[in-house]
């Protein structure tokens, strides 16, 4: 199976192309793409450097956030357009599954995933043994309580900083290990999702149209 992998919710574009469980292209190692935000340029590079064509792609996997909404929407729209124009299945993957897997692989611990939303709110979830739970859109007090409740048993992924908040007696806030997944990690998650996930022609980015939960 030829897979096109698209990740951008952290605001850093990365594209991969794989044949089965073997990566054929990873944009991270292409210095000519460094700093570019042109999704089409990344996809063209993936095909030109791998020798593959869009007609050979069996599935497009795209990071649907949560994260930077503009970047995520752009990449999801491009994935949907590719799928529609070429009759290719599109599968959306939760960004917290990607960064959760990445950090769990490195630390061998459950992972609390956090990213900022519209101030002062945050997205948060717990990734543990391949499962994502507690995903919610919360206020700052709730996310801080969640962090304190897990800081001795979990690792952290995403992007957050509570430095403006006075340190409590519990000590300093933990630091996220990573805010994006390597393309090899993305591929592992994608292939597992392919076995169980719904294959559609259109996916949607995770937005802030959620009820804010407060403590």
Segments (PLM) and residue ranges:
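Oxyanion-binding and handling regions
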Residues: 1-22, 34, 91, 95-215
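N-terminal beta-alpha supersecondary unit
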Residues: 1-66
């Amino acid at each position: 199976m030829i897979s096109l992998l698209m990740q951008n919710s952290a605001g850093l574009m990365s594209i991969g192309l794989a044949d089965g469980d073997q990566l054929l292209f990873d944009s991270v190692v292409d210095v000519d793409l460094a700093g570019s935000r042109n999704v089409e340029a990344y996809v063209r590079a993936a095909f030109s450097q791998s020798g593959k064509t869009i007609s050979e792609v069996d599935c497009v996997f795209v990071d649907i956030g949560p994260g930077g909404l503009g970047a995520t929407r752009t990449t999801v729209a491009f994935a949907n357009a590719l799928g529609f124009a070429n009759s290719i299945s599109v599968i959306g993957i939760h960004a917290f599954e990607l960064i959760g897997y990445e950090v769990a692989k490195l630390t061998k611990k459950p992972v609390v995933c956090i990213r900022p939303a519209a101030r002062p709110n945050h997205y948060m979830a717990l990734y543990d043994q391949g499962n994502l739970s507690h995903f919610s859109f919360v206020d700052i007090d709730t996310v801080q309580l969640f962090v304190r409740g897990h800081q001795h048993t979990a690792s952290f992924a995403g992007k957050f900083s509570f430095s403006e908040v006075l340190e409590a007696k519990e000590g300093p806030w933990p630091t996220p290990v990573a805010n994006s997944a390597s393309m090899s990690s993305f591929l592992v998650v994608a292939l597992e999702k392919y076995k169980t996930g719904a294959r559609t022609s259109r996916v949607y980015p995770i937005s802030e149209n959620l009820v804010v939960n407060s403590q």
